[in-house]
Amino acid sequence: MSKLRIPILLVLFIVSCCSAEQCGTQAGGALCPGGLCCSKFGWCGSTSEYCGDGCQSQCSGSSGGGTLSSLISGDTFNNMLKHRNDNACQGKPFYTYDAFLSAAKAFPNFANKGDTATKKREIAAFLGQTSHETTGGWPTAPDGPYAWGYCFLREQNPSTYCQASSEFPCASGKQYYGRGPIQISWNYNYGQCGRAIGVDLLNNPDLVATDPVISFKTALWFWMTPQSPKPSCHDVITGGWTPSSADRAAGRLPGYGTVTNIINGGLECGRGQDSRVQDRIGFYKRYCDIFGIGYGDNLDCYSQRPFGSSLPLSSILLDTVAAA
């Protein structure tokens, strides 16, 4: 078999020189059809050259979901998102456990790296961040504010979120406001995500609010896909990201706080104490407690410079104090 390896790799190299990549970071986070593995070079296949070292997605084939259901049961899911089907919640009864598992089959690396505690910590982090994005809780809410995640489905009082783009042009009459667990917004995000999961979200953005599996897929796509200069949320929370010297100088270290920075750092991070960051942490801690696992280090981003920001951290903090 070793004699065949060189020709196969040579073919991969030749193909890569002559056509566009098919998947992974080289193709905007696109997944391979039929559950095929995405190689480190951005090509789809099922052999060890594709599924082995450096594989980017679907590295175990199209199984997915099974491992996830052994980590979080339907009862645990319902306990975490305890009031999502309350009559006061806009999202009732949209967000289901089965839709979550079904969507995760397209992202088999989700909650599938490291020991059991690491896998559960990723689930807690994902549900914690998305619960904040969709929360219907308030300080004196029944069972506390962190039992009200996944209450909302669509952004309240939305804008159109349309930015001129030749690659992902806005469709006539369509709005790209926040929808679903991660509240995906802007035409370029709908376009990239739709391309990756194989759905035309530019022309049909409301699928994110009408099809629960697609809705969860958009959130998982965002979670699993790095977008330079940001790493993926998945890599950060599972220990797969090593901060550069620039990251360390900006206060960005492995942990839940950097996940918050990836999602909304421009508005929430590097500004000292922030109630939104506290809310994200509150959901995360509750879910970790339900799982019976530790929280890890670096939970907040109060002293982190947002990704892509060239301002000194002290300037961000000073601006915040001056505005207070």
Swiss-Prot record:
Induction: By infection with the fungal pathogen Ascochyta pisi. It catalyses: Random endo-hydrolysis of N-acetyl-beta-D-glucosaminide (1->4)-beta-linkages in chitin and chitodextrins. The active site is at E133 (proton donor). It comes from the Eukaryota. Its EC number is 3.2.1.14. The keyword Lipoprotein does not apply. GO terms for molecular function: chitin binding; endochitinase activity. Residues 310-324 form a propeptide. It holds the Pfam family Chitin_bind_1. Disulfide bonds join C23-C38, C32-C44, C37-C51, C55-C59, C151-C170, C269-C301. Residues 21-61 form the Chitin-binding type-1 domain. Keywords: Carbohydrate metabolism, Chitin degradation, Chitin-binding, Disulfide bond, Glycosidase, Hydrolase, Plant defense, Polysaccharide degradation, Signal. Belongs to the glycosyl hydrolase 19 family. Chitinase class I subfamily. Defense against chitin-containing fungal pathogens. This is Endochitinase A2. It comes from Pisum sativum (Garden pea). The gene is CHI2.
